[in-house]
From Swiss-Prot:
Zn(2+) 3 binds at C274, C279, C295, C297. A zinc finger (RING-type) spans 184-234, 342-373. Pathway: Protein modification; protein ubiquitination. The gene is Arih1. This is E3 ubiquitin-protein ligase ARIH1. Zn(2+) 4 binds at C302, C305, H310, C315. A zinc finger (IBR-type) spans 254-315. Keywords: Acetylation, Cytoplasm, Metal-binding, Nucleus, Repeat, Transferase, Ubl conjugation pathway, Zinc, Zinc-finger. GO terms for biological process: protein ubiquitination; ubiquitin-dependent protein catabolic process. InterPro entries: Ariadne (IPR045840), ARIH1-like_UBL (IPR048962), E3_UB_ligase_RBR (IPR031127), IBR_dom (IPR002867), TRIAD_supradom (IPR044066), Znf_C3HC4_RING-type (IPR018957), Znf_RING (IPR001841), Znf_RING/FYVE/PHD (IPR013083). SMART domains: IBR, RING. One of its GO terms (cellular component) is Lewy body. Zn(2+) 2 binds at C201, H203, C229, C234.
Length: 555
């Protein structure tokens, strides 16, 4: 173990049972390296490591109690969606949605507390209880129900652990003499008995092989809670104390901790990992909902789906949109220009020669048709390069189907291009913070106070909020059926979009001494108007949700 002081989570002796409590006698063990299973050791390593994004304050922030001004969806310290703390976690102030941001070590503490609560009833070693809870997806009630149904042997077999009450008996049966060296069954090198270690199943291997085996499982295969004994055919799981004792690399230990805590978080509907790269913080809510939460790293996301906060579109439609973009966006332009659909099976076909006689390569179709009119090829006779069948009914039907497909593609491209345009603009606007900071410094040199120049930062905050909202309005509009309410929505969208572009233009202008007061007035008026129009748009969409005014196009 590292000599540096780390976080060692242990139960108090009076809260954890001994082996006598489990009905087994305390026995001397030849293996002096065997850990005390009554202590859950997941933390003899610093949880903060450069480049892994773990750390920060110990205490979680209850975001409903923080203050601060409004910020942008992407700006430093900003708060998207109409509120949020300037430098810390933010939230939609009109929504009383309270949450905590937890560090990795706090999640470990939550795990230990969960194990402690269960152990007050079932009285098992902490490492065994952790494996049992993992098997039941950390559902304490299900574990308790199974534990007391009268069939403990079946339960422990399903969880791939040895019944603690048989622990001493198993150790005694597998005690080996230390009088002579013995070969390791993995590397076949001879070592003294003191260099061997193993699990309660009785299979023992040299410590070097154990370390390499565990490192491979953790770092290359990403396994944490399901690492089994390396003996062939043995499915007994390796406990946490054994892993932490046999691994010396702190990076491997840190990865193992993350794998174990990840299973705890993924099984808890009130917990969600921050989706930001290299951030190991977790958001804990009082109840799960599609609401915005902000991590300590500054990332704001939807707690329900984990995507960036996407008001006004719902998670269901955003998920469909993202999938559609992943499938279509890179190839749609090429498909529109170079391919047609088979009039029979609608498989997309590329013409790779000059002849208009097409044969569908779909093994279940094999339709023959004309590339020009999409009608059956048989009536074309010998007109190999000139189609004179434009007026036939079947050819017209095929062309109509093709036109509908093209129209659907053009509609998708219309919304996709505008969605991507606002996304790109949002990235550019994010760079405005550096430019605005420089302008604010220049304005202070022209006899303006620090407070007087804050309108520029506020304007960029509002601009980024509006860009993010507009980006997701095009996802909402793509799936929206036309009706009177959708027309109102599109008018609100157009008004906000126009005002946002004007505000963006103001902020990109060079500010001179002569235009200082004029541009300040224009920027303030315009960002206030943008705030108002954004609020109106969102309120109208939310009212439509409440009154069931929206009808959708199933893609």
């Amino acid at each position: 173990m590292d000599s540096d002081e780390g976080y060692n989570y242990e139960f108090d002796e009076d809260e954890e049972c001994s082996e006598e409590d489990s009905g087994a006698e305390e026995e001397e063990d030849d293996d002096e390296d065997e850990p005390d299973d009554d202590n859950l050791d997941l933390g003899e390593v610093e949880l903060v490591e450069p480049g892994l994004g773990v750390g920060g304050e110990r205490d979680g922030l209850l975001c409903g109690e923080t203050g601060g001004g409004g910020g942008s969806a992407l700006g430093p310290g900003g708060g998207g969606g109409g509120g949020g703390g300037g430098g810390g976690p933010g939230h939609e102030q009109e929504e009383d949605y309270r949450y905590e941001v937890l560090t990795a070590e706090q999640i470990l503490q939550h795990m230990v507390e969960c194990i402690r609560e269960v152990n007050e009833v079932i009285q098992n070693p902490a490492t065994i209880t952790r494996i049992l809870l993992s098997h039941f997806n950390w559902d304490k009630e299900k574990l308790m129900e199974r534990y007391f149904d009268g069939n403990l042997e079946k339960l422990f077999a399903e969880c791939h652990v040895i019944n603690p009450s048989k622990k001493s008996r198993t150790r005694q049966m597998n005690t080996r003499s230390s009088a002579q060296d013995m070969p390791c069954q993995i590397c076949y090198l001879n070592y003294p008995n003191s260099y061997f270690t193993g699990l309660e199943c009785g299979h023992k291997f040299c410590m070097q092989c154990w370390s390499e085996y565990l490192t491979t499982k953790i770092m290359e295969e990403g396994m944490g809670q399901t690492i089994s004994c390396p003996a062939h055919g043995c499915d007994i799981l390796v406990d946490d104390n054994t892993v932490m004792r046999l691994i010396t690399d702190s990076k491997v230990k840190l990865k193992y901790q993350h794998l174990i805590t990840n299973s705890f978080v993924e099984c808890n509907r009130l917990l969600k990992w921050c989706p930001a790269p290299d951030c190991h913080h977790v958001v804990k809510v009082q109840y799960p909902d599609a609401k915005p939460v902000r991590c300590k790293c500054g990332r704001q996301f939807c707690f329900n789906c984990g995507e960036n906060w996407h008001d006004p579109v719902k998670c269901k439609w955003l998920k469909k949109w993202i999938k559609k973009c992943d499938d279509d966006s890179e190839t749609s332009n090429w498909i529109a220009a170079n391919t047609k659909e088979c009039p029979k099976c609608h498989v997309t076909i590329e013409k790779d020669g000059g002849c208009n006689h097409m044969v569908c390569r779909n093994q279940n179709c094999k339709a023959e048709f004309c590339w020009v009119c999409l009608g059956p090829w048989e009536p074309h006779g010998s007109a190999w390069y000139n189609c004179n069948r434009y007026n036939e009914d079947d050819a017209k039907a095929a062309r109509d189907a093709q036109e509908r497909s093209r129209a659907a593609l053009q509609r998708y491209l219309f919304y996709c291009n505008r969605y991507m345009n606002h996304m790109q603009s949002l990235r550019f606007e994010h760079k405005l913070y550096a430019q605005v900071k420089q302008k604010m410094e220049e304005m202070q040199q022209h006899n303006m106070s620090w407070i007087e120049v804050q309108f520029l930062k506020k304007a960029v905050d509002v601009l980024c909020q509006c860009r993010a909202t507009l980006m997701y309005t095009y996802v909402f509009a793509f799936y929206l059926k036309k009706n009177n309410q959708s027309i109102i929505f599109e008018n609100n969208q157009a008004d906000l979009e126009n005002a946002t572009e004007v505000l963006s233009g103001y902020l990109e202008r060079d500010i001179s001494q002569d235009s200082l007061q004029d541009i300040k007035q224009k920027v303030q008026d315009k960002y206030r108007y943008c705030e108002s129009r954004r609020r109106v748009l969102l309120q109208h969409v939310h009212e439509g949700y409440e009154k069931d005014l929206w009808e959708y196009i199933e893609d």
